[in-house]
From Swiss-Prot:
The keyword Methyltransferase applies. One of its GO terms (biological process) is protein repair. The lineage of its organism: Bacteria, Pseudomonadati, Pseudomonadota, Alphaproteobacteria, Hyphomicrobiales. Gene3D superfamilies: Vaccinia Virus protein VP39. HAMAP family: PIMT. This is Protein-L-isoaspartate O-methyltransferase. Belongs to the methyltransferase superfamily. L-isoaspartyl/D-aspartyl protein methyltransferase family. GO terms for molecular function: protein-L-isoaspartate (D-aspartate) O-methyltransferase activity. The keyword S-adenosyl-L-methionine applies. Catalyzes the methyl esterification of L-isoaspartyl residues in peptides and proteins that result from spontaneous decomposition of normal L-aspartyl and L-asparaginyl residues. It plays a role in the repair and/or degradation of damaged proteins. The active site is at S63.
Amino acid sequence: MPIGPPPPEKMMFQLSLRRRGISDQAVLRAMDEVPRDAFVEPGQRAEAWLDTALPIACGQTISQPFVVAYMTEQMQLRPEHRVLEIGTGSGYQAAILSRLSRAVLTLERFKTLADQARARLAALHCDNVEVRIGDGFAVPADAGLFDRIIVTAAMEEVPASLLDRLDLDGVLIAPVGPHNATQTLLRIRKSKSGIERKELVAVRFVPALPGLAREL
C-alpha cells in the first residue's frame, strides 16, 4: 500500500491547496492524511501528487486535489454528520469525507469501480464508509436522510428525489450543467423556509448518468 508522497512533494501539495484558498484546517489535515497515490493506477503514482485530474477505470476520472478540497470545504462538515456521495469513482473523495464525518454512504453505478474503491477504503481503515452499487438518481429507500450530499459527476439538474434525501439544515454540493460543456458548482441549502441555491465556481465533470452500468 502506498504511504503518500516524499516530504518535498507533500509540502508542495499542501502549499498549492493553501495558495488556492483552502483554509479549513480539518480539510487540509484530511487531504494530508489520505494518500492519493493509493487511489490511482500503479503507472500514475508519480503524478498522484500533482494538482490535476487523472483517468481511472471505466472511462472515469479522479478529480484534481484542489476540486476535492474545495467541494469538501464548501460542505461545512461536522463530525456528527451523515454524508451521501453520488459517484464513488476511485474512492478518494469518500476517504476524505470519512475523516470529517460520522458515516458515509457512497453510490457507484460501475461494479468495477465500486469493488476497487471498497478494497482501497478497507486497506486504509475507512470503516465508516459503505460502498454500494447503485443509481444516484434513485437513492435506495432504506438510506434515510443525510446532513450532507455531494455529487461528483455533472447533473443537468438536481432531481427533486435527491433533495428529498437532504435533512433540514442540510447542504448539497453538485456540478450542474450540460454534459458536453462547462458546468457550475452549486451549493444548495435546505431549511424550513425552503431551498437556497448559490453558484460557486465553474467546473468540468464527467456526466452523471441514470441507472447501473450494463458492463464493467
